[in-house]
């Protein structure tokens, strides 16, 4: 199999948040969502999907700060990438109020060194996004004066799968499952463009058992996910002592057998896949953080998504249960998981 080198770029930043690149103030939460709260995690999930599909990957902007287009173009043009995907989110109007503009767009530049190939990639990604999400389509368009499209030395596309100024699509920005949908469908589009079969995310049978001494793309993927969970390890594709320690710590923190071996149960937990465990006040871990992210996307205030099921999270769960005709006991079992894990929905304006 040919080795393809895939770059991923996210627009704007979150340390600090890029001024103006945000939704109107969200009701119930009384804060806006910022564009990079969608762009960055979706980029990361796309890179993870590419690793699973045996691509080499390059993160154009690993830092949280906004980075100039010229700096990013310079980085990109040093890499000899097969292609580049940039993640953004659209807006319409003044940005202070919500409106009806909605839907998915993908973009390319006719000034790119490979305009026909860039358009073909934009069309393939667009097709997969339409099939794999519930978003309406706005089409594939050419843009000028966008440096990451026209000034790079590789095939390049930009995708914007929604509008920050549309109330329902604003909520989707911070929905982890919508982020995953966009990332995975974008990877499907890349696979389609490259003529390669796509390896699905949610089947743990696609993930090999890893242990100390393992090497390769799935070790890169493991290390990448661990770093996103706060473990300070080098992402080098080699399962050594530091990766072993991080795996053991992750297993301990999430109620798994702490043997340092990454089998089906550990992969399922790393990916936060169902069946999801019953959680309640006092619990911790990745499933609690996922719950908190889902509640936030549905506009139930709880504080930060820190993976700790405290009183604020319990109050949000009870409110969600009351408003969705569930037993309001503050315990997240199968029925509450089914309701909260839907993509989109939540409180209305």
State the predicted function of each range.
Residues 1-73, 100-102:
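Active-site histidine-acidic residue metal-binding/catalytic motifs
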Residues 2-7, 15-16, 78-79, 84-93, ...:
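Active-site-adjacent mobile loop/cap segments within catalytic or ligand-binding domains
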Residues 3-8, 56-61, 82-87, 105-108, ...:
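Structural recognition of the beta-strand scaffold that forms the well-ordered cores
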Residues 28-37, 60-65, 108-115, 169-176, ...:
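Second-shell loop/turn segments in exported
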Residues 114-141:
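Active-site-adjacent substrate-binding region
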Residues 196-235, 253, 268-307, 346-349:
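Acidic, Ser/Thr/Pro/Gly-enriched interdomain connector segments
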Residues 247-250, 317:
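Conserved hydrophobic/aromatic packing and binding residues within compact polymer-binding modules
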